[in-house]
Structures are given as C-alpha cells and as structure tokens.
Amino acid sequence: MGAFFVYILKASVYLAILYLFYSILLSKETFYRYNRTALLLLIPLSFILPLYPVHTAVPETYSNTTILDSLPAISYIENESQSKIPIGIIAVLSIYLIGILYFITRYVCTIIKLLRLIRSGEKYTDSDGLSLVVISQSIAPFSWFGKIVISKADFQNHRREILLHESAHIRKHHSWDLLAADLCIGLQWFNPAAWLLKRELQTVHEYEADNYVLEQGIDAKQYQLLLIKRSVGSKFYYITNHFNHNKLNKRITMMLKKKSNRKATLKYLYVIPVALCTVSVFAHPEISDELNKVSSVDLSNLTAMIGSSENTATIKNLSLIHISEPTRQAEI
C-alpha cells in the first residue's frame, strides 16, 4: 500500500509540472485538436514517468578504519516482530483511501441519477442518427456518450444550434476524454492539477464544439447570444458535456480570436524536454529516502495497527546467526 501511494504521489507531482507547462505555453493557442491531445497525453505520461528509475550517484565516503582479517566474522540478522509505522503515515494513507471511496461512491450515484433521467425522457432519433432524449425538466442541454439530453423548451426553440453543438461532442468522443480525466481524479483526488486538467479539457471540448457549429454556417452573433441566454441554466452532471459550460467569456473570445500561427505548433515539442526534466525531481537522495519509508508500509500492517486499541513500542531482537573464529591446534 505504501509503495502504491508513493507511486501516486510521484504521478501527481509529474502531472502538476506538466499541466503548468501546458497552461503557460499552450492553453491560449487555437489549435484545439492539438490542445486536447496534449491534455490527454499528460494523464498517461504522468503515470508512466514514476516507473522510470532514476538514481543519483552518491559520493563514497571512506573512514580511517583498520580492517583486521584475524577478527571473528559475526553476522547478524535484524528480526522485527512488527515494524513501527509513524502515526502520520497511517493518517495520510487512511485519508487517501477514504477519499478514493468517497469519489467512487459519488461517481456511481451520479451515473445512477443520470440513467434515471434518461429513462424518464422521450426517446427520438433524428435524421443524422443521433439519439435524443427530450425531458420536461428545465435543465441545460448535455451529451453523454451517444445520447443528447435536451429540454422540451430548447427542443422547440433552439433545436438546430443545440443539436449541432452536442453532436460535435458525440462525434469527437468527448465523453471518453472525461472518463479518462475522472479516472485520473479518482486516483489523484488530492491533486489540484488533476481537477484543473479536467476543467481545461472540458473548455477545449467547448472550443471544438463551438468551432464546429460556426463551420456549419450558424451566425456567430446569434450563436453567442444564445450562449449568453443559456448561461443561466442549471447543470447537474459533472461527467457530461454541457451546452452552457462555464467560462463563457473565454469561449466567445476564442470564437473571435485570430487563428494561431502554424509556427506555434513547435511549442508542443517542448513537452519532451519538460518530461525528461520532471523525472529528476525524485532523484535526490534526501527525497527518495523519505519516500522509501512510506513505500515500506504494508497494507496488512496498516489495518492491523488501525484496528488495534494498543500500539506498543517494538523491540528489536538481534539473533546471532554464525560466528566463525580462526582455529588452532593446541599441543600438550
């Protein structure tokens, strides 16, 4: 358990560094497809980098000790009946496990509520083969995998614009992106970078969908006005793509922004040296030594110590395994 937590801790640091690099250099570019790809690659990259072993050379130290071959060779094995685990490590690991269980429970409950809502609506299939769910509730339109959920009012008044927008999410498989981001958050729920990455990924999804709508001939001003009107709607499901997603100002700004120069794509090559530099973060001995202490914590020992009412101090028993002495024959 301790080793897994250290692995997740390293992955969270790598993700934070890589996301910081993205937000500084790439987030303002209009290469939506590249930005989406870059954000998605940060997730597996952050989990792969901790698997790469990096060690720094520690200078050897020599002491003025005289080695005597004639001295007896004594070997010891340290036998600990129970390793002593600091209470701080126990608390951190316990909180981490509770956080994972809470996130899983919340995620499952959200899916159950979403499925109930979809079942309660009227099912339609449009001419393009899109699966529509029309409900009586006044909620913001959203898409989830192959389904578009829309209220009756929006279906009657703004059907074309909304369906074009949500169909872009479906065609570009944005729901799978959010699933990957949620899996990352489930393991790194304590990491702000994981939450920021998902929010940025949702924003890029909206950029792509907005751009698709405008490419279909929808008037930009009318479409922006519709976004403003629908920005006051309620949204209930954080695992879906919403028509009135937050950061409306950024979306409108991106619609009006001049396309980035093609030379700006060279910025994406910076991810290679940045990834290599992040590997060296945990190569320092003082950091690796502390992490090794946490890695040595076993889940069985952890649960035993949490469940026990008494946590007594351990006593190290040193067992003498073998003693070899030079032997001589004595003459009488």
Give residue ranges: language-model regions.
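Short extracytoplasmic/periplasmic juxtamembrane "stem" segments immediately C-terminal to an N-terminal membrane anchor
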Residues: L68-A73, S296-S309
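Membrane-embedded and juxtamembrane structural elements of multi-pass membrane proteins
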Residues: G2-I287
